[in-house]
């Protein structure tokens, strides 16, 4: 059975289960994997006019990849806790061979080339999204980025020549549209409705909710890892099918298969820059990672590239680029970006997008409005400027040059 025939049967089976309603007319019961969940009926209403460029579900993203990726290659880099394949799209040539030391050893030797090997000067860009299942903006962004690399245009037909130009100058591109396949599969929506300033539905679907429809909330969702799926309530899209939020996995203990897949692929590819796309900001915002101190100044420069351009494009809360200051960037705690940095030496950065389902209030009570087109523009501008940064600064080999040369 080929992929597309299999998809038809899977979709039919899912629709039958998803369509069954429980006795309470305000709750809907559906199954994802081996788990059955009840969610308020109203929370599962989709936007009526979903744009054609908004490709975000596991099924639709997978179909898009197999229909459209011609210049790159699709690789299955691992499987989720629920057994779902994690797909990456890669362009260019991978690093060859290995170094002579561990990453930690190379830091002790004061020459990262000892870890990265003879292709140390290569530049490798890694973009990933969907670490949390209902943070759709980054998924849509990477799908459209793949479209640009393949055709020169996003799925709206808009050309991005500078993305094509920068991508051609990078030795290796790695794009992972959905990291947390389980969390995304748990949410049957392609695109939620917009609820104005009310973020209840987004938080319920993303960070989870209680049986009465109230939200667990952030950061409360991080108090219990793993979550017990046997308890009443809905876990949201944060955890995988083992109940683990892989953004905060047990990195030095028993790692989840998604985390291990990222670790193994990162050790193989040894990227310079990882852009970890999330949702949870008033305006698109880059977070300062908890990482090697030597990369702090590198982050400052990356921040200015991205945030300044977003400001110029009127996608920030200010129209004055001179107001952009990396010292005001939110500071992340120890998380998967820290672990990836200390695992392979990459500068790994969280970027938070606004949500399509609600608009945050800003000063004076006004709403920071973001249309789907604006959200996509911000995603692609972020990737474009991050790529430009990598091209113009030269990557890890130039950020921390070897004193042994």
Each PLM stretch: what is its role?
Residues 3-5, 9, 26-56, 156, ...:
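C-terminal accessory segments enriched in acidic
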Residues 115-120, 233-239, 340-344:
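Short glycine/proline-enriched loop/turn "hinge" motifs that connect secondary-structure elements
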Residues 15-24:
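Hydrophobic h-region of N-terminal signal peptides that target proteins for export
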Residues 93, 180, 355-356:
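Short, glycine-/Ser/Thr-/acidic-enriched flexible segments
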Residues 59-122:
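Soluble metallo-hydrolase cores and metallopeptidase-like ectodomains found primarily
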């Amino acid at each position: 059975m080929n992929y597309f025939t299999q998809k038809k049967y899977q979709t039919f089976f899912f629709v039958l289960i998803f369509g069954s309603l429980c006795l309470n007319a305000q709750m809907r019961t559906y199954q994802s994997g081996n788990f059955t969940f009840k969610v308020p009926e109203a929370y599962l209403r989709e936007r009526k006019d979903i744009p054609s460029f908004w490709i975000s579900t596991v099924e639709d993203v997978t179909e898009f990849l197999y229909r459209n990726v011609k210049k790159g290659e699709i690789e299955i880099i691992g499987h989720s806790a629920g057994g779902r394949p994690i797909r990456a799209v890669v362009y260019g040539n991978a690093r060859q061979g290995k170094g002579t030391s561990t990453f930690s050893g190379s830091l002790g030797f004061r020459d990262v080339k000892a870890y990265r090997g003879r292709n140390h000067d290569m530049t490798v860009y890694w973009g990933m999204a969907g670490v949390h299942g209902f943070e759709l903006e980054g998924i849509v962004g990477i799908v459209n980025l793949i479209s640009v690399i393949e055709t020169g245009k996003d799925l709206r037909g808009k050309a991005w020549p500078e993305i094509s130009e920068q991508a051609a100058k990078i030795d290796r591109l790695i794009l992972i549209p959905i990291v947390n396949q389980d969390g995304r599969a748990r949410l049957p929506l392609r695109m939620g409705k917009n609820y104005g300033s009310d973020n209840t539905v987004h938080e319920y679907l993303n960070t989870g909710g209680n049986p009465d429809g109230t939200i667990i909330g952030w950061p409360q969702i991080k108090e219990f890892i793993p979550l017990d799926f046997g308890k009443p309530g809905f876990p949201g899209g944060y955890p995988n099918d083992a109940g683990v939020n892989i953004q905060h996995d047990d990195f030095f203990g028993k790692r989840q298969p998604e985390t291990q897949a990222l670790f193994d692929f990162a050790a193989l590819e040894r990227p310079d820059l990882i852009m970890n796309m999330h949702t949870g900001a008033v305006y698109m915002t880059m977070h300062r990672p908890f990482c090697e101190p030597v990369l702090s100044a590198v982050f400052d420069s990356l921040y200015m590239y991205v945030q300044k351009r977003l400001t110029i494009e009127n996608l920030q809360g200010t129209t004055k680029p001179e107001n952009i200051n990396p010292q005001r960037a939110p500071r992340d705690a120890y998380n998967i970006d820290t672990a990836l940095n200390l695992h392979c030496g990459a500068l790994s950065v969280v970027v938070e997008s606004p949500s399509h389902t609600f608009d945050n209030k800003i000063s004076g009570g006004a709403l920071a409005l973001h249309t789907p087109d604006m959200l996509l523009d911000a995603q692609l501008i972020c990737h474009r400027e991050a790529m430009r940064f990598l091209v113009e600064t030269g990557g890890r080999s130039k950020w921390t040059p070897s004193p042994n040369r």
